[in-house]
Amino acid sequence: MKIALDVMGGDHAPEAHVEAAIKAVKAFPDLTITLVGNEEEIRPLLPANDPRLPILHTTEKIEDTDQPTTAVRRKKDSSMVLAVREVKEGRADAVISSGNTGALMTAGLLYVGRIQGIDRPALAPMLPTLDEKGFLLLDVGANMDGKPEHLLQYAIMGNTYMEMVRGIKQPRVGLLNVGTEAGKGNELTKAAFPLLEAGPFHFIGNVEARELLNGACDVVVCDGFSGNLVLKSVEGTAGSMFSLLKRELTKTFISKLAVALLKGRFKEIKQVMSYSEYGGASLFGLKAPVIKAHGSSVASSVYHTIAQAYEMVNQQVTTIIKTEVAKATKGSEEKGE
């Protein structure tokens, strides 16, 4: 198995990416990782000339400030585009990047392409829950608007991922809504509800945003606009809460002593709400795994993203998604007749 890793994207590139790759090839004996980036920066970070860590040299990079479509078309020798093209040309089974999200989605669509039967891809991160199991949220911005049939496809893809990669039997699939009653919501959610109810997965109905971190379900589907709001709210709330705790608990000498005694516990609490161990956000609906690692990913987070990509390839997630979507499409057509 071979994974292409863009080592020029993200806040901690290339050190975090190379460190993670070294750890990953030790953990997975059949894995080769192509490090795509500036060889002058990468080579000193490698312990030796490991044949399982080849370098694809380039000095061109897509910046976070670049316009996605323009950057992908003009910067054809950028580390991100070259990494994605490794998949297109059959030299890699999956690709990972911590760079410009929009550019990665554009490159994935342009070079990897959609699975037949998938109308719109979905960007899907795992978010933390209090029970430490996490939940998959899709879409969080690949498409701002959605149609009912898109949400059905998101549910099929999310269900497949949670079963095959996260090992959850009969994942609970929920529809993000403003209330739990079947008749709640806007035109999109009202039309999507019966499609999801008849889908080939365990649909539990509508779920409210306030219940997500409590582990209300394993897969949450919504349009990209709503999903992005949830994603940013969760990230922002977690950060604000820890800042508040730090401020309030360091006001007095006594409270500072208490913090010192409970430092380990606070670290554990922070870890519960961290996304790092869940890997990156998969761009579901493409012919091969294309995964966006968080821009601030450190080595441990990049490593978990590599492990995520490895499992997706190993479990043939894209093949199963293609089969399940084809079944659902055929079933809908037969009912329409």
Curated annotation (Swiss-Prot):
EC class: transferase
Gene Ontology MF: a single term: phosphate:acyl-[acyl carrier protein] acyltransferase activity
Family matches, as InterPro entries: FA_synthesis, Phospholipid_synth_PlsX-like
Pathway: Lipid metabolism; phospholipid metabolism
EC number: 2.3.1.274
Subcellular location: Cytoplasm
Catalytic activity: a fatty acyl-[ACP] + phosphate = an acyl phosphate + holo-[ACP]
Pfam family, one: FA_synthesis
Keyword Lipid metabolism attached: yes
Main location: cytoplasm
Gene Ontology biological process terms, A to Z: fatty acid biosynthetic process; phospholipid biosynthetic process
Keywords linked to the UniProt accession: Cytoplasm, Lipid biosynthesis, Lipid metabolism, Phospholipid biosynthesis, Phospholipid metabolism, Transferase
GO cellular component: cytoplasm
Record function comment: Catalyzes the reversible formation of acyl-phosphate (acyl-PO(4)) from acyl-[acyl-carrier-protein] (acyl-ACP). This enzyme utilizes acyl-ACP as fatty acyl donor, but not acyl-CoA.
Similarity annotation: Belongs to the PlsX family.
HAMAP family registered for this protein in UniProt: PlsX
Record note on quaternary structure: Homodimer. Probably interacts with PlsY.
Annotated protein name in UniProt: Phosphate acyltransferase
Native organism: Halalkalibacterium halodurans (strain ATCC BAA-125 / DSM 18197 / FERM 7344 / JCM 9153 / C-125)
